[in-house]
A protein has these predicted regions:
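N-terminal amphipathic/basic-hydrophobic helices that include classical n-h-c signal peptides
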Residues: 1-11, 182-183, 187-190
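A generic local secondary-structure boundary/capping motif
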Residues: 13-14, 67, 117-119
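A short glycine/serine-rich beta->alpha loop
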Residues: 28-32, 99-102, 139-142
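Residues at secondary-structure transition points
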Residues: 33, 37, 104-108, 145, ...
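A conditional alpha-helix N-cap/helix-loop micro-motif detector
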Residues: 56-59, 110, 151
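Helix-loop-strand module that forms the ligand-binding subsite of alpha/beta enzymes
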Residues: 82-127
């Protein structure tokens, strides 16, 4: 159940004007597979910031049922881990909708979930995907030192993103664009 949208607003002549977009941050991944739990860890850390217009959600995987929640927000930020080398860094990329005519099953990726939200409700939030490198995806509940270090970078990037999103949910990223391979993993491409 979502809390009431009590984000910051100003009142002029008895008209309430929202000055901040409603933002949902979804951290996802399996906390029992070491670095795969990065997304949920980041979501929990950001929840402690207690920002009035920011809601956080931790899930094991992205499911179609999340579309019903996403439609209520202006901006969505998805946070997940990706298998990487020590040299790779946090990546922030705008997410484009995908065609939802192909069924993805019970779990999906952010692009498909946004496309589904658009198809079902006629709108979807502006969205970004924050991917954080991890090196250990074996069974376990402890994050690798690389993951711990990159989480700090992710928090800085998300903080910058939150400060840059305006009242319309618009943002002009200065980051690299991610291309999605057939394996479901991302490859970094310069724009």
């Amino acid at each position: 159940v979502l809390p009431a949208f009590g984000f910051s607003s100003t009142t002029m002549d008895n008209v309430i004007i929202n000055t901040y977009p409603a933002i949902l941050l979804i951290g996802y991944g399996n906390e029992l597979r070491s670095d795969d739990g990065i997304g949920q860890r980041v979501s929990n850390l950001i929840a402690s910031w207690k920002l009035a217009n920011l809601y956080t959600l931790c899930v094991h995987q992205l499911t179609p049922e999340l579309a019903e929640i996403l439609v209520n927000f202006d901006v969505a930020i998805f946070v997940d881990a990706y298998p990487a080398t020590v040299e790779q860094d946090v990546q922030v990329s705008p997410i484009e909708l995908v065609d939802t005519s192909v069924t993805m099953g019970h779990s999906s990726n952010p692009s498909y979930l946004l496309g589904l939200t658009q198809a079902l409700y006629g709108r979807s939030p502006q969205a970004w995907w924050v991917t954080v490198p991890g090196v250990n995806f074996e069974l376990g509940e402890t994050l690798s030192p690389v993951a711990e270090q990159k989480i700090e970078v992710a928090l800085q990037e998300i903080n910058h993103l939150l400060k840059t999103v305006d009242s319309d949910g618009e943002y002009k990223p200065k980051y690299h664009h991610l291309a999605f391979g057939s394996s479901g993993f991302c490859s970094n491409q310069q724009e």
